[in-house]
Amino acid sequence: MSVESIFAIIEQNKDVYIEFLRSLIQSDSFNPPGNEKNVALVIEDFLKDKGIKTEIFPFGDNRANLFAFLNDNFTGKNLLYNGHMDVVPPGSKADWKYPPLSAYIKRNKYIYGRGTADMKAALAAMIVSITILKKIGIKTSGNLIVNAVADEETGGKLGTGWCLDNVLKKRSIKCDFVLVGEASGVHPLPKAIVLGEKGHLTIKLVTSGKSAHSMAPSMGKNAIYMMSRIIENFDDLEKYLPKIDPPFTIEELKEMVAVALPPRENFDRIYNDQPLLRSMTEALTKLTKSINMISGGIKENVIPDRCEVLIDFRLFPGQTSQMIINGLKKLITDIGFKVNNATTENLPGEVYLEIYSDGESSVWEDYNKSQTVKEFKKIVENTYGKKSFFFLSAGGTDSKYYRNSGYCKETVHFGPGNIRQMHATNENLELQDFFNSIKVYTLFAHKFLSTE
C-alpha cells in the first residue's frame, strides 16, 4: 500500500484518533499511586473490534501493563514500540488554565492536559499505527508489538523492566529494533532522534549529632553544622571521582544538531541565544549534581541531632552509581566524619549514606553503522518537512532497559511533544505533532516489517 493510502486513512479518521487520545488523557493515571489499569482498559476497548490481540498483566492496586500484537508470528524481524501509561501528578490544579484531566482542545490546534506530551500522545499514536497496519493487511515475516507500561515515572522496574523479563524474554521474543515514544521536540529545533540518556542517582545523606538545650550548645553536637561542612565542600567531589570521558564531546554534540540547521553559523546563533539548548548540551558531557531537599531540627531551642539531605546526581554513560558513592564517602571522610553503613544507632559525629533511587545511563554509540536508524530519520524528515538530528537526553527513559540488558542495543526514543512541556503546568501538545507521529510510526513499521 502506498504512502498516500496510509495518509488518507489517517486524514479520514482524525476525529476518531483525537477522541481516543482524549480518552487516554482523561483516564487518571497519576503516579503515585499509578492506576495505569484505567488506561490499559481504554486501550483494550479501542482495539477489541480491530483484530488486534491484547494481553493485560494486572498487579498491585489498579495497576497493569499491556501488550498489543499485530499477529501471532515472531519468527522474522520484530519491531517493538514502548510507551508509558503513568503520568506525574498535576500539582496545584488551581494553577491550570484547563483541568489536567479535561483533554481540552483549544482552537482545534492544541490539546491540554497532564500527559499530553509525556506521553499519552505517543502512546495513542503507537496504538493507532498498529490498527492502520492491520486495516491495510500488511504482510510480514515478524511482528509489531506495542507495550504500554506502568511505573515509568517512578523508575520503570514494575513496567518495562517487568515486561522485558517476564514476557519478552520468558517467551523468547526477540526484537530487532525498539522505539520508545518519549517527547523529542526541543524548541526551536527540529525533532530529535534520541540515542541515549544520562543516568540518575539520588542519595540520602544523614548526619548524626547529639541533642541538647541550646542554652548550652557545647553539651550537644549540631547535626546541621555537620551537614553544612559537607555542603561547603560538596563542589570538591569531582576530585574524588575517576576520570572518564563522555561518549560525545560538546563539539560532537553541537555538530549532531548543526547538520539539521545549515549553515553552521545559523546553528551557532541559535545555540548562543537558547540557554536551555546550551545548558542541556553542556550537561550531557559532565556529571551534574544538586542538593535539592534538606530537613533537620525539632524546635528552635534544641540542638538538632539529625539532619538529612537528598542529593540528585545525573551521570553520563560510563559513570556508575558506585563511583559516585565511593567518591562521596572519601570526601566525607576527609572532612573528618566517619561514614557508617548502619541505618540506626549512628553515634554523634557519624554520617549515614544510602541510595534513595537510581537509574542507569545508556547509549547506542555506533548508531551511524545502522541502516535502519537512517531510514527512520528519513521518514521523520519527510513527514515533518524539516531536517532531524541525533542527540542524547539529559533525563532518563525506559530505553535503558533494552540497551543495558543486551536485549536490543538498537533502541531510540522519538515522540510528539516538546520537552519544555513535560511535567509542566498547563502541559499541552500541537495536534499536528500527534498526527505526524502517527504517520512516522505507521510508515516506519510498514517499511521495517513489510515483505511485499
Where does each model-flagged region fall?
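An extended, acidic, His-containing surface patch that forms the Zn2+-binding/catalytic region
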Residues: 39, 52, 74-76, 187, ...
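Glycine-rich phosphate/pyrophosphate-binding beta-alpha loops
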Residues: 87, 211-214, 396-400
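Short, flexible turn/loop "capping" segments at secondary-structure junctions
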Residues: 207, 302-307
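Acidic/His- and Gly-rich active-site-bordering loop/insert found
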Residues: 2-116, 135-140, 312
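Fold-level recognition of mixed alpha/beta catalytic cores in primary-metabolism enzymes, strongest
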Residues: 111, 115-117, 121-287, 423-437
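Short glycine/proline-enriched loop/turn "hinge" motifs that connect secondary-structure elements
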Residues: 95, 138, 194-200, 283, ...
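Non-cysteine beta-strand/loop elements that form the S-adenosyl-L-methionine
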Residues: 82, 203-206, 410-416
